[in-house]
Every structure is written in C-alpha cells, then in structure tokens.
C-alpha cells in the first residue's frame, strides 16, 4: 500500500470536513500574509490566513482501527531501523538526558535489542570513556584488550581491574608479545601490593588460540582447560585479541542484543552544534561510538544545519542523526545535509516546557506524520510524548522507525542517580535538558543560550521532578515490547514496516479518551504497564 503517511478512518475525514486539506498537509506559509490566486480566470492578490486551519493531533487524539489479522503477537517481527546503517531488534531508544542515559542504561538498552544515546552533560573525556565502557562490556572477541607490563605492580593491576570491572589482564612486553596473564585468582591472597606482576602472573603453559578462532571453537578450548580467558595471538606471539567465557555466556543470555560487526554492543552519543562539538565528535568516534546525535531543541536552524553539514563532511562514514524538528521542511533540510536519521519532537516531553514558554511546537503525532514525508527513506526517531506502550505503537504507525523515551526510563535501576525514599515510596529524579540545573551543567547550548553563567540570565525550557522507582529497565522494555506486539496483532501487521504503512487511525473525542482508560472503578492494584 503506497502512502505518504498513515490513512485516517472515514470518521476523521467527516469530523474535519470543514478543512481544505488533510491534517498531514501544511497550510500556506507566506509570512507576508498575501499571495496570488486565480479568480474567474484572472490572477488577483488576496490575503492568506496566518493560522493553519487543519487540526494538529497528538497520541491521545487518535486510536488505531483494528484490522483482520493472521499474525499472532508472539510471531511478529519488531526489528526496525535506528539509522540508515544501524538496525534495531526492538524500536526503542533511551534519550540523551543526564537523568536517563549513561553507560549502564546504554548497555541494558543494547542487550535488549535497542540502543541508548549517551548525554553530553559531561566532559569530552568522560563521555568517550562511557562509550568505551559500553563497547568493552561484551564482545565476540575483544580486539584491543586492556594490557599491563610485567614490571607493573599488583596495586596497579587491582586498580585497573576495579576500574574496568574485569577479572583478568594479559601481560605483554614492549613489542606487544604475550608473556603472561594475571587474574583475580592470582591476586586473591596477595598482600604485597608493590610486588611486580612478573612474580605473580601465570606465565607457564599459557593457553592461547590462533587468529581466526571462532567463538564455538573458543568455547570448547575454555571448557577443556577450565579457564575463563583465552588470549588470541598471531604466529609471532603478538597479542591480537581476547575471548572470555563471560562474553560467550552473555551471547546466550541476551540473544537479541544489538551488536556491531565485532560482537560489541552498539551505542550512540550526543554532541551539540556549537563550541567544541567537532572535538567531541572526534573523541567519540575514536572511542568507537556507533552513531553521533546532534542534539538541539531546534534542528531547523541555520547553526544546526551548518554543524550537521560540517560533521558529515569531516566524517563521511559515521552514522549521523540530527534534530529536533517538527515539520516536513525541517526534516527535508536535515536530510539534504546528509543525516542518516531525523529526530522529531518540539516540546512533547513530560519534562519539557518549550511550548508554554515559547508558544512554539507541533503536537507529536502530526509532527511525525509531516516529518516522515520530508525525510523520505531516511528513518525518523519519534522523541518524546510516550506515556504508555500504545503511544509507541501510534508513533510507529505514524511512520517513525523508532521511539525515544526519557521519563519512562528515568525511574529504572540503570538510570543515573540514586533512588530516594519519600513517604514510604522510592523515587528517582528526572529533569529536562532544558531545566535550569541541566542548563547550568552544560546543556544551555541545546537551547542556544551557551555562554550565560548566571542562572538569572538563563531562560529554562524544562523542569525537574521525580518519578516512581521502576526496577530494572528490562522490566519496562518487556512491557513496552509486549504492548507493541499486541498492537501489531490487533491491526494485523507482522512487521514494523507493515505497521508504518497499513493501519488506519480514527480521531476520538474526550469521551472516547475517557472510555479508553479504566473508568467507573477504583484501582486497587496497579498493573506493571499502567499507572495514573
């Protein structure tokens, strides 16, 4: 079924019969308030309205119409695209917010089949280290394993293993040749922290594997020798990689994990569009980041467009995402600058005040519909406004390829910050990147207010708040994917691509929205995927 956006049911067309265009088409944008039209065969000057008469919609304004289905929810394919070059097993992304995504969240998202975007409210070195931690968290074969020299001390080995949360380190000489290995077992009863590793490491009968060893072959070697780490060496004895039993077990534990060609978890990271953004981009790329996100509040500004073009020219092979936009023109402008995905959403987030502070924005469903038209074949990321799993289904049905979530994930174990108790319940903090405190910590450039040091000189576009503690993010993702599967089953779509093209929406009234939620009862026990 060909489409430029999802179709709307007859009831919606009837409800909007007074409009002259469907809700996905823009009204004339002539800011001068005049234009040419043909009256009785002659051109005449006429005044054009500056107010678009078509109704802009958000998720609560519509429902998807059930359709004939031959697909069971458990059999649907939830894979989609994050960018032109990055696939997802589930179309869910964690937002680049400093109360949502650091390395713990990014690791959990990738293991579930999604991806996390590391926030940029940190130093360049720390953000690059966060990328490195995600990439090192698991691997088919670690291509550049952390190493030590035989002259290093037990103290240095302990510090290194604690820092990277690893249980062993290969020991190499000045030429990179493997001379031994040190593990937690070697150090468990070592009391002399200044003892050189040459006296503590295992050097005799080292078990190694040649370059080209498969993971299945490596597993057999590890099991045969009852060891946990297998150095990979070339014919000269030079260390070329490391295979661990932990990574092999994780491959079975997380079969849907989103990994790169080397078996490492995928991760994206945010940069700005001014200042040292190019230095930050280089550091992230050197650390192995899979995608760069130029993260701004207004992606259809010349500064952002220029920065996007600069990054694309400097790094033609990196997967590049930019935003945020809310119109077809904004999406088209970013695509013309070479992005691999467009991020959509101006003001829909629960912690965002952009629309009331500035008076600017587009309700998220309409923003997605229009941006998908402008982006063409380039994936669209729907950023913000997701309260329930059904909202994610609607965003994907509107044409988005993935959905970005912030506040929904802020209360999970993997989000930055500690949980706190209030009136007997556990909470975690969440704040918009446009909140006053976040802007003071480094996100002011996202709102084009960089350089302002005094809080009194900042104009925030977000708030700080708290959300209930939700436990592991895997529990939240399980419910989100379960709702997505059920939604796909109801509308008869076996794939995300079919969901993006086939279903119909119907516009609903406030009475219809009330009817959609639990009503006429007192909830005595909340469901894991629904709360008021």
Where on the chain are the PLM-derived regions?
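Glycine-rich phosphate-binding active-site loops on the catalytic face of alpha/beta enzymes
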Residues: 114-126, 289-301, 343-358, 386-419
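Bateman/CBS regulatory modules and CBS-like beta-alpha motifs in cytosolic regions of diverse proteins
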Residues: 76-88, 95-97, 126-164, 171-173, ...
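Active-site-adjacent beta->alpha loops and helix N-cap segments on the catalytic face
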Residues: 124-132, 238-258, 276-278, 297-317, ...
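Short beta->alpha transition motifs characteristic of CBS
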Residues: 118-123, 166, 170, 177-193, ...
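Catalytic beta/alpha-barrel core
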Residues: 118-121, 147, 168-170, 208-209, ...
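Catalytic cores of alpha/beta
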Residues: 105-106, 279-284, 326-344, 387-401
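Alpha/beta catalytic cores of nucleotide-metabolism and tRNA/nucleoside-modifying enzymes
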Residues: 8, 12-68, 148-149, 210, ...
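Short beta-strand/loop segments at the ligand-binding rim of alpha/beta enzyme cores
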Residues: 87-92, 141-145, 261-269, 311-326, ...
